[in-house]
Amino acid sequence: MKLGYKLLFGACVAANLVATSCVDDMKFGNSFLEKAPGGSATIDTVFGSVIYTQQFLNSIYGRQYYGLPYKDDTSLPVSSSPYCGKIEALTDCWQLHWRDAQLYTQYYSGIHTANYGRRQDKFCYNDEKVWEVVRWCWLLLENIDRVPNLDENEKARMIAEAKCLMAVRYFDMFRHYGGLPLLTASFEGNESSYECPRATVEETVNFMIKLLDEAINSGALPWAYGVGDDADGSSTYVGRWTMAGAMALKCKIWQFAASPLFNDNQGYAGGASEAEQQHLVWYGGYRQELWDNCLKACEDFMRELQARGFYELNHSVNTTPAGYRYAYRMGYLYQGSKEVLHSVRVQMGDAFNSSTYFWHNW
């Protein structure tokens, strides 16, 4: 089974870099996604400056998956729109306070099918900015050696961060679709073909784990950002990928891969579909070694945690139910919580009646 690269290429073309006439007015975010006038001048501009390269990496961070619907904007993952909703709202994690979110109307009414439109799926294949992030990360990896006066330690860290960003965005989609096309370079726009076979579940998992292993083993990522234990002391960098975050994501990937969703004696949908026959949505049988891999990844993390410290559970000030409940809430509510292994943050602004529709307005 093959998936045409046309969808991927269409998404990636929209992410071309743009050069500006004023060096101090480099545009990122929405403006940064405008179509470039042509040639490689835009790449030369971005990777001709340490500051611009840092800003480019920052723009990639801005397309991570965020747990709350916070803005309806086509430059952001479509699940960021309150109109769409979040997959977590179908679990016991939390609820949407607007009953007409597409996630609710499609699933709870039992009318969800593969023929969905924009905002109607729990995780859209080509509108979650996954492929844009993958392309941007490859652009950074392919061009970072060109950046003049970039400190070697910072360069190594940025490379490791880009690999983590690719891995986490692949995982965001993997848990919904299974095997995915594996992109190993950026596109220039003049390739003769954009067709690529969809990888198996096993190949996709190995691809994500390889990216994380390279980031972890590079030694370029600090264990934590903040003050205390083995943290680097820079609280302004909180939210960037760390060694702890990368190791934790590795545990999560193996856990999903080993779960009955992908790892069982029979395919989730019975085993007769084309996707199941080609092992695109499961491993093709039960494998105990997947749980062994998950266990080892967890043991590796706990061993590092014991040696390095910093992260810990919040403790109740007393033994009452209210005390434990408060400690639990502060674990995810408090911005400086040491329970958080990787923090994804957004910073937006909306005026009254601006139609940007923040989650707090619903």
Go through the PLM ranges and name each one.
Residues 177-183:
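Short, flexible active-site-proximal loops enriched in glycine and acidic residues
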Residues 10-16:
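Bacterial N-terminal signal peptides
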Residues 191-203, 286-290, 295-297:
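Structural transition elements
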Residues 42-72, 95-177, 192-233, 238:
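Conserved, well-structured interaction surfaces
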Residues 23-102, 180, 213-214, 240-247, ...:
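An aromatic- and glycine-enriched ligand-binding surface/loop that stacks and positions planar moieties
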Residues 1-8:
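Bacterial N-terminal signal peptides that target proteins for export
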Residues 186-190:
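Short edge-strand/loop segments of extracellular domains
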